[in-house]
Amino acid sequence: MTAPGPACSDTPIAGLVELALSAPTFQQLMQRAGGRPDELTLIAPASARLLVASALARQGPLLVVTATGREADDLAAELRGVFGDAVALLPSWETLPHERLSPGVDTVGTRLMALRRLAHPDDAQLGPPLGVVVTSVRSLLQPMTPQLGMMEPLTLTVGDESPFDGVVARLVELAYTRVDMVGRRGEFAVRGGILDIFAPTAEHPVRVEFWGDEITEMRMFSVADQRSIPEIDIHTLVAFACRELLLSEDVRARAAQLAARHPAAESTVTGSASDMLAKLAEGIAVDGMEAVLPVLWSDGHALLTDQLPDGTPVLVCDPEKVRTRAADLIRTGREFLEASWSVAALGTAENQAPVDVEQLGGSGFVELDQVRAAAARTGHPWWTLSQLSDESAIELDVRAAPSARGHQRDIDEIFAMLRAHIATGGYAALVAPGTGTAHRVVERLSESDTPAGMLDPGQAPKPGVVGVLQGPLRDGVIIPGANLVVITETDLTGSRVSAAEGKRLAAKRRNIVDPLALTAGDLVVHDQHGIGRFVEMVERTVGGARREYLVLEYASAKRGGGAKNTDKLYVPMDSLDQLSRYVGGQAPALSRLGGSDWANTKTKARRAVREIAGELVSLYAKRQASPGHAFSPDTPWQAELEDAFGFTETVDQLTAIEEVKADMEKPIPMDRVICGDVGYGKTEIAVRAAFKAVQDGKQVAVLVPTTLLADQHLQTFGERMSGFPVTIKGLSRFTDAAESRAVIDGLADGSVDIVIGTHRLLQTGVRWKDLGLVVVDEEQRFGVEHKEHIKSLRTHVDVLTMSATPIPRTLEMSLAGIREMSTILTPPEERYPVLTYVGPHDDKQIAAALRRELLRDGQAFYVHNRVSSIDAAAARVRELVPEARVVVAHGQMPEDLLETTVQRFWNREHDILVCTTIVETGLDISNANTLIVERADTFGLSQLHQLRGRVGRSRERGYAYFLYPPQVPLTETAYDRLATIAQNNELGAGMAVALKDLEIRGAGNVLGIEQSGHVAGVGFDLYVRLVGEALETYRDAYRAAADGQTVRTAEEPKDVRIDLPVDAHLPPDYIASDRLRLEGYRRLAAASSDREVAAVVDELTDRYGALPEPARRLAAVARLRLLCRGSGITDVTAASAATVRLSPLTLPDSAQVRLKRMYPGAHYRATTATVQVPIPRAGGLGAPRIRDVELVQMVADLITALAGKPRQHIGITNPSPPGEDGRGRNTTIKERQP
């Protein structure tokens, strides 16, 4: 670690800091610090932290300690604006030491990278030597394994030789999880000579290709679709470990020794100490295993100060806050120690703990005084920076800048102060976080006659003009010694802009690659044959050709066959598009093969679906016919409002905003639905749309189902539009009569621009002067008559609907053009996955968890789902945490009382809300980040998923505890549900089943109907497909009627059966995982054009290497199916070893002549519309007949010739020279060479 030296010019606020440090007060400080005194007490306002740290870092390396993790994030971001990459943030674990939860993989990776840079300052691959490390008191007090900085990461470079098996073994050692498809950090997958690795500190996973043991290529790929990202170049990958306690031979041996001494009892409580030690001895990582570090690691523990270079000073910011925080952390850590191990000890035969609880205390936090004493022993000076005065301290000549907090009068005063300051030749700077905001500030200064201009990054302000900079600075300062005034955007607006590190780790979109994961016994729906049960995947050789099939089981076609007798159906892989998983509530009866029951069920469903489609289309037709208002393009004010958004928009959010604006600018009334989980940024889209409408002189109504939501939106809209002349009012049950009248009058005379309210807005007596846009939040929660009212609005004003229930992608596609949809799948940048704990109910643990939340000034939800005993539950919570303010809420309370209670909880008048599942939807309380659910074994998966979505909605880490009674045995389904929720804890979790359940609800919301009977009858996926087909028919009819043409009713697409001697399959040595192989088959079967087939082939090549011959033939068969479907042919079969039969095919006379000329031995039977053609031989007489791709091409040539169309090439060839693909990669053999 070295002194970062003078500020770098390419860092945004470097020049500004350079100017500030020229003040005598800082020059004296640097001189004083140069002597490295053991103690140094400084006094300055909090806004001077950046300058003090920058001054001290000039003299040599420095460790800065803050009271909270958030303060550390912000200070690190500001220091990076001065010193660039010479600054590192050392985050603390999100978990407390004995919480039985392991810290997140990304946290561990970031910590190990910082410690590695401290230990190896010369390692250029990791960046320049560190000059400043910023951390919170939590990391300072937390003991760690000695020599963590010496733990070697795995480094791979293109062109290097690395034994393939050695690399895989090393990844396992570094605690990476092996999976068949990489989806989150800390995972890796192996496929032949290709290795996919998602390192904890990487933005995207990396695909590494080996040729033998040489690394030939590396490229990043996207988690969403598993395709390479060609724009990003990468030559070296540094993969840090995923845990700080690695299961080395020594650690495993020690665990085995302890486990042998105390064998687990027969009925061990999962998670007992014995259970944990037994697993660790086998090398299985367990959640929360870091807690037993003191008993497994014989060399004692180290502190952060032990990892620093000699003589590095520790600068503690706000020492008073740090001391309080340290005491709280130690107390809560202690509670978790007792809670965790008293439960866990019970797993041994004699019921005594295999480890001494006192000894385990060694992995808990160390007292602050002990850390200070240890620092003194190792020669680290201890310096403090306080805001409270002290006689022996050095007081710096720095003042905090005035703050306007968004009040216009105060902003004018600040501008006047700046004018006066620069008029006397002083220096002034205004720092804003975004480029757009910075440009807007220049305009606003100019409007107030204050000379201002933009500065380049790293430039210092000039005298006589306010320099405006884009950079990471939160609070302004006044430095008389440098004649400098610095104001920030926070000082003006009062809104805290988050320290969005330009590059937060990539947010994960919900997986688009959705392997059809089938396990034996799953119900599936076959379009033609109905509901069957999946048995297995088999490979059969027919006529010398190997093919894979799915075996399905159906009810016996014989009457009285009984449940035992079942019929089997072999589905070839090229017909996989006919299959979908059955989702639809209760388990249905299996269909009979060949019976008419399935056809009848489908006909009924189709009839019901037609009605809905007709209604949707007629509404669409009315909208098309009625002229709406075409809004004008964006104004400069619109750009100003959007630049002031305090967060980085996600890709989905930007797309949705663009789509909404494009709709508004068309003359046809908009009808768009925006789907996205609560907290994914739907409100911001509504704010921008509303503002756009107001710019055109139109009024906006925002309709919400509850008073709480109305208040939340009122606050958000008010804050976002505070600097603009827009009148926003609320109208709900809590609005008193006089105010309600005033609002209603304002709507009639046009003085109110935006009104946010509940269904009161829909009552008679509310008149509008010029309503232009209606925003509806959670439409499904309104009553029937309110929905009808909203529907009637749709034909003449723009309507934007927001829904938190996910909507199936397929439905979204089929509604295109009728109800437009935008889906937001990406979580906001700052959100972390919720840490999920599933375990037995234990009062000590609950008390510790609630206290930990109160420690960070947060709030908690406590879910108890029985109204009869909820008051008793609340009383128990009050006993556990007497200092907390506890309140009860449930659906049977009078509505006014319920809303008031939740309102007061939102206003932070209560700490813990003991409630039923009413919190499941729509509640957005960002300060509540701990959720405790009693009797979690009685909830459904989608309920658990929705409940967990209530917490972790801000920059704080969320915690969810799903508890079950320790003495009650869990049912198998309850166990499965809890295991699923425990495993799927990343954001937008891939909880396919729960999401399906929610999607069924979402589909009902959008279609506005109750169709559960039909959904159950045919299964959800097929139902949605029927909706799509019906809509397409109506849409065609509508277009045809508009053009004065007659319309044909669309027929159900027929399945094409191809049964030829073609060895076409995806070999298991090409794609080893059944799940992924099935996905490959399904993608090819579902391709609906040659272009889509080519795209699937590209993707397979990218993910698994060049296609082997059988896979290329499979693609050729997929193309032939498309050609047959386009020609109306449903059956292509090798009738014998010597002939091929095609049907149905009706040939006019000219085509019959052509057929006889091409194949003299061919037969055409007009009565059955069948053509039979001999299969030619590969050479002269006696040679074998053609097969595989040649045969497929022959059939294709025959079809195109008979239709009088040009020949179509069916085979898939490698476009590059043999042995190389388009990227110049060697593809001759994909298997690794020995």
Swiss-Prot record:
Residue window of motif DEEQ box: 777-780
A GO molecular-function descriptor: hydrolase activity
Helicase C-terminal domain boundaries: 842-999
SMART domains for the chain: CarD_TRCF (SM01058), DEXDc (SM00487), HELICc (SM00490), TRCF (SM00982)
Annotated spans, Disordered: 1207-1234
Key words of the record: ATP-binding, Cytoplasm, DNA damage, DNA repair, DNA-binding, Helicase, Hydrolase, Nucleotide-binding
Positions annotated to bind ATP: 676-683
UniProt keyword annotation of Nucleotidyltransferase present: no
Biological process per Gene Ontology, one example term: regulation of DNA-templated transcription
Biological role: Couples transcription and DNA repair by recognizing RNA polymerase (RNAP) stalled at DNA lesions. Mediates ATP-dependent release of RNAP and its truncated transcript from the DNA, and recruitment of nucleotide excision repair machinery to the damaged site.
Similarity comment text for this entry: In the N-terminal section; belongs to the UvrB family. In the C-terminal section; belongs to the helicase family. RecG subfamily.
Record protein name field: Transcription-repair-coupling factor
